[in-house]
Design a protein with these regions (language model features):
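Membrane-embedded transmembrane alpha-helical bundles that form the catalytic cores
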Residues: 1-463
Length: 464
């Protein structure tokens, strides 16, 4: 059960909000935890046990860390943190990477590991990172050990962001779990953000996904150079509006319950360097890796060789976090090379270029990265990249190019404008509550019609 299915929109969300505001304040975290567990069980059944086990392990390890720290036994506290991290990484490896590694070994003739046919629990990459942050934050003194397993359970299972983020660090919600403010203005803001995210997903991402699906299925003889670029542009907008739409819905729904989650996107497609792009894209993941991997490894306060190694580890981890496939690792390494090239060679040169040219440079490189990301089959990836770069003697245009432009140019232009701050800037300047309400109701009506028509597609990031 996910945010843009009719059942959640019509029943679950309304029911949970109603119960939440009817019960006393002291019971609200319990309501959220039980509702979130039901939400997850509805879609995953048996895998709910894995999440409960992760919750219990990290809850108890947090208490152990606090006890050992208070007794001056720092060595034992570090062991408790290491045990927590090992457990979370172990379950993540088993469910997400075991079969990938087994198949990779078999492809080179090594039958060391059985292929188990394990399905991936939805959201495991998100909630394991959240629970790991808890024990680390407690050890560092950045957060208090949570005495209430209900409060901690609410943090881990919180259904607005359980399945696809943002990845919430425990210290960001520590005090909100025990004392958060509720107001009509905050609730209304949450509703507005939720509807905006829903519209991003259903009205923009899903429609552009149809163009990308059509383009990636074309044979080498059917593609033209422009068609290949149109397809990957559609995917770039699809993944942005799909994932940022989910984040907006999660932030909005969290706000309805009194929580304030971190922003996960900040208009990445307006960036003028690859470094800036990654400050704006999937912010919760990049900040998690910076705080819990890059800095502990030494960050940039070390020799150049060590710094390059630290960055390599971060980008390998970023790549394989997205999926158990070699193309994701290649995607991470691609950005590693781009970033170190910018930092070591291109930084001052880029600063002297006009803004539009820097933006074009980022756009081209990011679109190439999405071809690597989206196509798991290396042969298909190579053919598609060759088509984009005009290396296969393909025509610049063909009849399909005209067909796709006629049918999808309006939604591509809408997506291009909506991926910049233009819309939100004008929305904030609009001083007409009645008009704002009418726009939101119209958007909600359009989304409802889309869902009722049965044209729902799952969020892309659920598979990560």
């Amino acid at each position: 059960m996910v945010f843009s299915t009719p059942l959640l929109l019509l029943y679950f969300q309304t029911l949970v909000l109603l119960v939440y505001y009817l019960v006393p304040l002291r019971l609200r975290n319990g309501v959220l935890m039980l509702a979130s567990l039901f939400f997850y069980y509805w879609g995953e059944q048996g895998y709910t046990v894995i999440m409960l086990l992760s919750t219990f392990i990290d809850y108890t390890h947090g208490l152990l860390v606090r006890r050992f720290k208070s007794q001056g036994k720092d060595r034992y506290a570090r062991l408790a943190v290491a045990s927590s991290v090992f457990f979370n990484l172990a379950i993540l490896f088993f469910f997400k990477y075991w079969d990938f590694l087994a198949r990779s070994l078999r492809s080179i003739g090594l039958d060391w590991m059985p292929v188990l046919g394990i399905s991936l629990p939805i959201g495991i990459s998100f909630y394991t990172f959240q629970t790991m942050s808890y024990t680390i934050d407690v050890y560092r003194g950045d957060a208090r050990a949570q005495k209430s397993i209900v409060n901690f359970g609410a943090f881990v299972t919180l259904f607005p962001q359980l399945i696809a983020g943002p990845i919430i660090k425990y210290k960001a919600l520590d005090h909100q779990l025990e004392g958060r403010s509720h107001s009509l203005d905050r609730f209304a803001s949450g509703v507005s953000r939720f509807v905006a995210g829903l519209a991003k997903k259903l009205l923009i991402a899903n429609n552009l996904g149809q163009l990308w699906d059509a383009c990636k299925q074309l044979g080498p003889g059917e593609l033209s150079v422009v068609t290949a670029w149109l397809g990957i542009l559609a995917f770039a907008f699809q993944i942005y509006f799909d994932f940022s739409g989910y984040s907006d819905m999660a932030i909005g729904l969290g706000r309805m319950f009194g929580f304030e989650f971190m922003e996960n996107f900040n208009y990445p497609y307006i960036s003028k360097s690859i470094t800036e792009f990654w400050r704006r894209w999937h912010i919760s993941l990049s900040t998690w890796f910076r705080e819990y991997l890059y800095i502990p490894l030494g960050g940039n306060r070390c020799s150049r060789g060590r710094w390059l190694f630290n960055l390599l580890m971060v980008w390998c981890a970023t790549g394989i976090w997205h999926g158990a496939s070699w193309n994701y690792l290649l995607w991470g390494l691609y950005f590693y090379v781009l970033l170190i090239t910018e930092k070591l060679l291109l930084g001052r040169f880029l600063e002297r270029l006009p803004g539009w040219l820097r933006h074009l440079y980022v756009t081209v490189l990011v679109l190439i990265s999405w071809a690597i990301f989206a196509l798991e089959d290396f042969s298909q990836m190579g053919q598609y990249l060759a088509a984009m770069l005009g290396l296969r003697g393909l025509p610049l245009f063909n009849s399909l190019t005209g067909y796709y432009l006629r049918n999808y140019l309006p939604i591509l232009l809408i997506a291009a404008v909506a991926s910049t701050p233009v819309v939100i800037t004008h929305w904030r300047k609009l001083n007409c509550p009645a008009l704002k309400l009418a726009v939101l109701l119209l958007g909600l009506l359009a989304c409802t019609a889309y869902v009722v028509a049965g044209t729902y597609n799952p969020f892309l990031y659920f598979r990560f």
